């Protein structure tokens, strides 16, 4: 079970060839349970200019399992952000902290192309696809 970060979805939908995109295509072909959350969907859709393309991507992302953060999830995300900062890691996106908190809550690996998660994994036992 995996939650896919915005960075990988954007590369996929823009047709960029990369290792993370190839791995995502492999995960989809293997019918691995793929999770997302509203903020990931929002970030992906925010970068699409065409209304028609935005609707298609929204439909595509709607096929995956949507997990919803609770107040406790948000508090955990804030803890992740603060603890990483204390340990010398600047996390650029609080959304990444929220996605990490969801990964812990739902026992998910994160498939990413974003150094914030690798920084979080230096402080917390975050499971990242391909890093085992």
State the predicted function of each range.
Residues 51-55, 84-85, 127-130:
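Short, hinge-like loop/turn segments at secondary-structure boundaries
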Residues 6, 38, 95-97:
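Conserved glycosyltransferase catalytic-site signature
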Residues 1-36, 46-59:
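Short, well-structured N-terminal submotif of metal-dependent ribonuclease cores
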Residues 4, 36, 68, 111-112:
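Short beta-strand scaffold positions
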Residues 1, 100, 104-132:
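Acidic, PIN/NYN-like endoribonuclease modules and their adjacent C-terminal/linker elements
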Residues 65-111:
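Active-site neighborhoods of divalent-metal-dependent phosphate/nucleic-acid chemistry enzymes
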Residues 9-10, 41-44, 117:
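A generic structural signal for short hydrophobic patches within well-formed alpha-helices
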Residues 5-6, 44, 77, 103:
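Generic structural signal for small/hydrophobic residues in well-ordered secondary structure
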């Amino acid at each position: 079970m995996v939650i896919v970060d915005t960075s990988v979805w954007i590369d996929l939908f823009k047709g960029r060839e990369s290792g993370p995109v190839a791995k995502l295509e492999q995960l989809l072909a293997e019918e691995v349970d793929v999770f997302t959350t509203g903020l990931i969907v929002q970030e992906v859709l925010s970068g699409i200019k065409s209304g028609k393309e935005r609707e298609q991507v929204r439909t595509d992302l709607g096929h995956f399992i949507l997990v919803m953060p609770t107040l406790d999830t948000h508090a955990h995300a804030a803890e992740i952000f603060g603890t990483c900062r204390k340990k010398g890691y600047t996390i650029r996106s609080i959304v990444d902290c929220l996605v990490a908190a969801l990964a812990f809550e739902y026992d998910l690996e994160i498939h990413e192309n974003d150094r914030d998660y690798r920084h979080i994994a230096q402080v917390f036992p975050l499971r990242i696809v391909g890093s085992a």
